[in-house]
């Protein structure tokens, strides 16, 4: 059975489109399309540094809109996790969310999986290192599952959402699903730490039924 949010179509946006792996600078940000997965983007802000430290805009609606990310965010979240914590792969079923995620302390490997019905990249995943050092952000449109694993001793993770959290609307996929095949960069000997809920999510194969 198809989950309702899968009817979010992978349509062409009227806003500026960015070709696969092409970079474009708009205002104070650089946006890179993630391979051939339409709508999935890595955002890099301009950092102004001097002897005192640095300053950067982490979000500016006008700059993002010019770069093709015209989203109204309504909720900001922040989590703290220790090394080896893996959260995901999560989505909301009837209230799907656009997300803009970044790391303010530490380092994570962040993953998005395309679950949009009709998408040419349905079931394909993309991962990116987000860290306090590289200051990259990951824009994940509606219709994706999302998760991350912490690679540093600790990590502070923040994200903006285009819809509110609905606890009764949670969906998920098991993190190590063989059909999706996410290549988590987990060093040998590092223990993974998952919540009981994240250990029990279903498979991609069941999700498609």
Predicted region positions:
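Conserved metal-binding segment of the jelly-roll/cupin
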Residues: 130-152
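Short hydrophobic alpha-helical segments enriched in small aliphatic residues
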Residues: 8-11
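Non-catalytic, conserved peripheral segments adjacent to functional cores
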Residues: 18-133, 152-154, 161-209
